[in-house]
Each structure stands twice: as C-alpha cells, then as structure tokens.
Amino acid sequence: MKTVVVDTNVLIRFLAGEERYRHAFDAYGRILVPAVVIGEFKCGTDGKTAKGRQQKKALETFLAKACVELIPMGEKESDWYAEVFRVLKRQGTPVPQNDMWIAATALSHGAPLLSDDAHFGQMPMLRLV
C-alpha cells in the first residue's frame, strides 16, 4: 500500500476541493497527517464563522477516513527532527520549525512528502512527490 505524508498547504487545498489534490490523494492507500499539520490548519480557522465551521467539519470528515492516520510527535520523529536540523544548519538553509517536524514525520515513516513548499527540497534525505 502506497503511503504519503501531507503538508498543511496540500491539506488546505484538498479540503477546499481543489481537483489536483483530490487526484493526488487517490493515488495513495495510506495518508499520514502529522499532528503539527492539524495544529497549523486549526490556527487558520476559528470554527465560529460559517466558513470556519465548514472547514472544521471537512477536517473531521477527512480524519475519520480509514486511509488517514494522525501521527503524533514521538521519539522517532524527534530523532529525525534533530538530524534535519543538523543538516540544514550545516547547509546554512533555515526552514521553519514546523516544517522540520513535518519532514521528520515523513522520514520516520519512510514515506514521501506531498507539499508545495519549495524549501522542503533543501532536505536531501527527504523524498518529495
């Protein structure tokens, strides 16, 4: 079964109904969502407006799918986070901390990352789709 980790920007576009992302998700039998992605998503919606309630419901529906798994930050992810940090520091290429956690989740699960953020390309050990 093909597995992919999703970044926040992709999740937002998928939940907004963008066709390109719906087809991208159809290619995978297992979709991993790092906890930090959910946190970032929730920062962008308050759940109090009609649009916010719709976004919250869309997220809940998505997370309830059998192929979707919410991934907490654990020891494996922490080890990979430290490695990503060291590599980026040596390269002199800073990346937002949350994105290092997202990359660490993909690396700890041996899965590629689906993202539109170009700075993930600065991580040579990370596979992107």
What does each model-identified segment do?
Residues 40, 80, 122-123:
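Phosphate- and divalent-cation-binding pockets in alpha/beta enzyme and binding domains
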Residues 27, 66, 123-124:
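Short, structured coil segments at secondary-structure junctions
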Residues 103, 107-129:
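Acidic, PIN/NYN-like endoribonuclease modules and their adjacent C-terminal/linker elements
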Residues 10-11, 37, 77, 101-102, ...:
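Alpha-helix capping/helix-boundary segments
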Residues 43, 69-112:
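Active-site neighborhoods of divalent-metal-dependent phosphate/nucleic-acid chemistry enzymes
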